[in-house]
A protein has these predicted regions:
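A short helix-and-adjacent loop within the catalytic ATP-binding
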Residues: 25-27, 50-60
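Short flexible loop/turn segments at helix-to-beta-strand junctions
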Residues: 27-37, 72-74
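A conserved beta-strand-to-alpha-helix junction within the catalytic ATP-binding
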Residues: 33-48
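Conserved catalytic submotifs in the C-terminal HATPase_c
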Residues: 60-71, 105
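Glycine-rich/acidic phosphate-handling loop/turn and adjacent ATP-lid/helix
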Residues: 107-134
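Conserved glycine-/histidine-rich ATP-lid loop and adjacent helix of the Bergerat-fold HATPase_c
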Residues: 133-145
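C-terminal end segment of the histidine kinase catalytic
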Residues: 142-174
Length: 174
């Protein structure tokens, strides 16, 4: 008998496998029928805003998801690379969005996820994040990104940092 948890795993696997197809679809044609897809669209907008700042000013950018979620003025002007979306998507969908902090400088974006406060929450978050990291690593390495993962502190912060490996990864317009 299939459970809701099994259905979520199948759905996530399907989405990750089809990320390249999704990335080739023009932003305006994306459907927003489920909460996860709405969240993904928001992630795309957030990263377009971040990348624009990083390209123009070459300054560090650091934002809390809660602050961004309330900003309705962010506009997406072009497609963000699939690797960025995939990594952020698996992290956000596995833990509560306000527990994700991301920052960027030059060609590197960092994602930091904090575990829950209770022991039971921490254990559950740790298991979910383990799955998320595995999926993200597989995907990002398959499209040519170097990925570094580290843990630090008593709060069990989990940082996932990536930057383009050697040469730039081709985007959907190439």
């Amino acid at each position: 008998m299939r459970t809701e948890k099994d259905d979520r795993k199948v759905e996530k696997s399907y989405l990750i496998e089809n990320w390249l197809t999704l990335n080739k679809t023009p932003f305006s044609q994306w459907k927003t029928e489920t909460q996860h897809k709405n969240l993904l669209l928001m992630c795309l907008e957030i990263f377009e805003e971040m990348e624009t700042e990083l390209r123009k000013e070459k300054i560090p950018v650091k934002m809390d998801f809660r602050e961004i979620a309330e900003d309705k003025e962010i506009l997406c002007t072009c497609q963000v690379q699939a690797a960025v979306c995939a990594l952020f998507y698996v992290l956000v969908c596995e833990i509560h969005p306000v527990q994700v902090l991301f920052s960027g400088k030059d060609q590197t974006l960092s994602f930091t996820a904090t575990g829950g406060t209770g022991e039971t929450e921490r254990k559950a978050d740790s298991e979910r994040l383990g799955t998320s990291r595995w999926l993200a690593l597989q995907y990002l390495q398959s499209v040519g990104y170097d990925v570094k993962i580290s843990r630090s502190g008593k709060k069990e912060l989990i940082s996932v940092t990536f930057q383009t490996a050697g040469k730039a990864v081709r985007n959907r317009y190439d």
